[in-house]
Amino acid sequence: MTDTTELQTGITRDIYGMPAFISLEVDDVRAAARWFVEALDFIELFAMPPGDEPVLIHLRRWRYQDILLRQGAAADVGTGVQLSLAATYDELDGLAARARSFDGTVVGGPADTPWNTRDLTVVSPQGLRLVFTARRPEPLRDAAFTADMNRWSQEQLPS
């Protein structure tokens, strides 16, 4: 699992080539941005044009966790599509509580997974499924699964 220490050292306002990002078409860009900022700790990096009626807002949580909200007819996100975001174990309960306080938000978890993570699933009012996933601390990990992963990694990944 990715070491999140470097990624979470403060939200950067750098403009960089994003290796991957998701665009979400929404009917109210400003309202959607407000939800991401207030419910899930994203920042509004910039809006085009600035002001109350932007057609695009660039959101960011940690480095490389970027979302573009674009003005358009609200579209069906699609069955089986989700955005997974690295998180820290200690922040999941707070994110869940904050997200639950917003109408139109569906929250599942946080819950432990068989693969040694703790996941929080949040479905935005726009229908985007976000999964915040954090590595479980050492004493809470399944030792048998860790041993399997180490063995499988040695068998399948070049050294």
PLM region spans:
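A short acidic/small-residue loop/turn micro-motif
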Residues: 75, 114-115, 135-139
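Vicinal oxygen chelate
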Residues: 26-31, 61, 83-129
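Short acidic/glycine-enriched loop/turn segments that link adjacent beta-strands
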Residues: 51-55, 77, 113-118
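Conserved beta-strand in the GNAT
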Residues: 67-70, 131
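N-terminal beta-strand motif that seeds the catalytic metal site of vicinal oxygen chelate
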Residues: 1-33, 82-85, 134-159
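Core segments of cupin and vicinal oxygen chelate
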Residues: 14-17, 23-66
